[in-house]
Amino acid sequence: MLQVYNTLTRNKETFKPLKEGEVSIYACGPTVYNMPHIGNYRTFLLADTVVRTLQYLGYKVKLVMNITDIDDKTIRDSKAAGMSLKDFTDKYSAEFFKGLDMLNIKRASAYPRATENVDGMIELAQKLIEKGLAYEKGGSVYYRISGFPDYGKLSKLDFDSIRIGASVDVDEYDKDNPRDFALLKASAPEEIERSIYYESPWGKIRPGWHIECSVMAMNSFGPTLDVHIGGVDLIFPHHENEIAQSEGATGIPFVRHWIHGEHLIVEGEKMSKSKGNVFTLPEIVEMYGGEVVRFMFLSVHYRKKLDYSETFAENAKNNYLKLKETLDNLEFALKNVEDEPGPGDLETLKTLPELENRFREALEDDFNTPKAITVFRELSRTANVYLETGKNMQVLEEIHALYKRFSDTLGIFAKAGGEEVPGEVVRLVEEREEARKIKDWKTSDAIREKIKSLGYIVQDTKEGPKIKKSEES
């Protein structure tokens, strides 16, 4: 039974969606004003991990991830770049999607944009004013946090010293010292000049950051959703404010399960431009490959800080390559096996369900991917032991099927077994075999090097030559 740590209660809870067998998930997506760094993608990968796990457990899942394409940062940086807000945010939205593909992150069911949902934000602000939970001031609309007694229930911060009635326009304000926050902001003259405004009962406005997610989540799922995902940095003020807005308007719980991923740090320190330790995803992928980066993220539980370093990344790469080599060996054996029964067949078949039970139990324990990877490595060892002597087609097929279930659930080896070896490489391997038969080792070695230059390597096995793509290519 799936147990999920709920930030709201600070406890692991038995997961129960509103509708049996179906799960609604809203995840905070990118603010598209620059290249997302690797910490952002750790959170996006968390959403993908939750989706894949739930699907593995038999749930039908709908994930919605927003794109914040209008806020303080996008307006500021688009102006600095000399671009329209739309052209600027479209550019970085495209970069965001490229990053998802690099990490083999499944597409969400929808990616609503803030600019496409402003009418709903104006309606929500009107409703909150009618309930006495919001007020207009200077053409902006603010949330009155003193009117919502449950304010602070998610972040568990001490709000005894809240300054009642003080209001701020910034999207990100001082931690531990909240103010009435802006739902809708009066557009500044320079924003109006750039056509960054929407007509409202209070004049020309543009949305604040927090109201965007409340509206997009409720537009997608109604007043209550099963799961809301984001980074720990969003607990306060962003998610606290989402609760205040949504529950203030509807009077019913907004989210059943809050899931928050921890920070990614670099060699023990928080990423910052001043320290020069901010890495974008393309930079890291260029060094290690997308699947290795994904595997690296999965090797640390989402509620623990991930301390990125070159040593840590290299260790993840080595473990990933060992698992991939086993898959390559399995697929090679399936194509070349003689299909003979052996003494280890029954014992191996008996082991597989036990391993799958442990894999499932790991993921049911609050999406414990490091523990699931440990079980995956045990399956790899089991497979390699069998491959030394076993030749039973049924056993090999069952090992391979379980291996693929594990890898698909973790989202790795997406391209394994699907790439055709170029005809030129196949021809060179055949020529090399002819040279080896007559013990012409010089020619054999020369052909091996030529094959390597084409991005492939040859492994000589007792079943014959095995071709695989070089990890360096």
UniProtKB/Swiss-Prot annotation:
Binds 1 zinc ion per subunit. InterPro entries: Cys-tRNA-ligase (IPR015803), Cys-tRNA-synt_Ia_DALR (IPR015273), Cys-tRNA/MSH_ligase (IPR024909), CysS_C (IPR056411), Rossmann-like_a/b/a_fold (IPR014729), tRNA-synt_1_cat_dom (IPR032678), tRNAsynth_Ia_anticodon-bd (IPR009080). Its cofactor is Zn(2+). This is Cysteine--tRNA ligase. Pfam families: CysS_C (PF23493), DALR_2 (PF09190), tRNA-synt_1e (PF01406). It comes from the Archaea. It comes from Methanosarcina mazei (strain ATCC BAA-159 / DSM 3647 / Goe1 / Go1 / JCM 11833 / OCM 88). A motif ('HIGH' region) lies at residues 30-40. One of its GO terms (biological process) is cysteinyl-tRNA aminoacylation. The gene is cysS. PANTHER family: CYSTEINE--TRNA LIGASE, CYTOPLASMIC (PTHR10890:SF3), CYSTEINYL-TRNA SYNTHETASE (PTHR10890).
